[in-house]
């Protein structure tokens, strides 16, 4: 049985319309949005009737799964070889379109916060960092093209709207083979929606929720000519919301458009454009001060906002991308991907530091308000080309992928800062944000850098025996960074190796190894870049799948050894900027275990349940990044009632253990500030009114648990209990 036949059996048909007069509507939308407009399926086999093996790449792994599934039959995560999760010797999680819809995960950050083994550190209202296995995640890829995020500046990567993505793949552990510099925490691959429909179809949604949160999204797709060889898709949306935080208001607009052209029977060209704009008034910057000058803790309301009335945070991102795919009759496939991104931000911010008097609310002589006006521009250009397919050796079939890539990132950051005295701030106990905007001094250059990566990579999956396979590969990377604060060139070879042994038709054991090489964009207080992170990553475990891959499970143990890992220094900044200062740690070791089960347990019940426990310490025995939880549990379920098939209900719980940070108290002593363990409970229900129309309700933080989202510094509160109601019309 071929992979296409399996996909056909598994597919759930989407309601559609074939009226050709609808072509013009989509054509106009595509032409308006995209100004640059200019199949062979490999054979597969089955382990048995209940377990799927993918032995070669299909032309599009992102579209080959049922619309309402929580799993996918195959993914290129980690190696670019199109494999089942059982055949990948690393921990892999998948968030499908249906899971994102059920849980109402409106941006990438919301999605990542609900992934097994990933934890969030919400620095303030606009900036959130993600960690896995004790390490900061900075590898984000778009359709397999790497893009590095820095912790210093926020260009909105994690606030990118989820409506434009078909799914999100996550590989925990080092992925240097495919992403270049290897981050040992995790790599996030966002797979964009494609123009793959040959009939006109659409999805319209509107939602309203707490704090006047209004959201409208349209997703239209269909053919642009009679034969369907030219297709288009547009996803656009608008969101406007207040917040539980006083004086905070946010507006978001996005437009995503893509066209696909079948140049021949075996060659397809995809072109696309992604525009995202976010404008925020009253954003917070860091956390609220912890103590009064007498050493007593300050008790805040969740609504307290330390920002001034004149503050804002505006982000604009534009991406253009292209993909050319050719499938050959011998099962080989060649892909060339390219993207160009221009992102900029403009932010006026205010941060309070020091200790106010408990009675008068006036900050002590060491306290002040730090006002900053920041502008940044980042351009990224990346090209990736690779070939993949089967080959025969020693009488057995194997798979190979080989490719080259190039990326260039240019960054330019400007700043202007001013100090507000305690007298200008006034009584902190009655702070309302009503303070005069400073007379900003002339712009100064914070940094201007160009980072380049050139690489070649290759990996092969060797079928050693019927149950045993070996994945081996390597990547050669040339890395350079030149600019105002960096002038370095590094070359590195990153090896990768993994074994997978099929125990029986449902279970496999695996083990893998890869080295770590991560040049750091972190800087110390003097503005010097930290040395590259180096190390090793080991992982071993067991995986299973059932019902043709509809449900998957994994249990893995890992050990990560690192040198020169950058750790944040509380209340320390680079050259008086808003950039957090870091220091290098020696001999960091993270070891632990994670578990996940995901998919359709029955015809009516889908769930994702994952748990992670790790311990990360440096050579002195000190805990690494102690503000991140070392134990976490995440559960989400969706259940369609058998007696009332139009009603689906579900929910979940996220739990994490106690964390702490070290801060300087008014006595000048280092004090540990703890955040206790907490659970968050979420619920949802959806009723299918007609075949096309559905209504859904979501409740977040059902029991209104309160905690500090900024464990690395200050106080910032999580969102209280809140709701949303959405109406969705599909055709």
Give residue spans per PLM region.
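Extracytoplasmic beta-strand/coil segments of soluble accessory domains associated
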Residues: 70-93, 109-146, 166
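Short acidic/polar hinge/loop motifs at secondary-structure boundaries
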Residues: 120, 129, 145-172, 191-192, ...
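Outer-membrane beta-barrel translocator/receptor signature
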Residues: 148-149, 164-166, 177-255, 263-267, ...
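Acidic/polar loop-and-plug regions of large Gram-negative outer-membrane beta-barrel proteins
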Residues: 239-243, 256-327, 342-378, 422-445, ...
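Structural signature of Gram-negative outer-membrane beta-barrels, strongest in the C-terminal barrel
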Residues: 262-264, 378, 397-409, 447-562, ...
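Membrane-embedded beta-barrel scaffold of Gram-negative outer-membrane proteins
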Residues: 325-329, 333-339, 343-349, 509, ...
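Gram-negative outer-membrane beta-barrel transporters
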Residues: 467, 583-664, 703-706, 726
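C-terminal beta-signal and adjacent terminal beta-strands/loops
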Residues: 656-664, 683-731
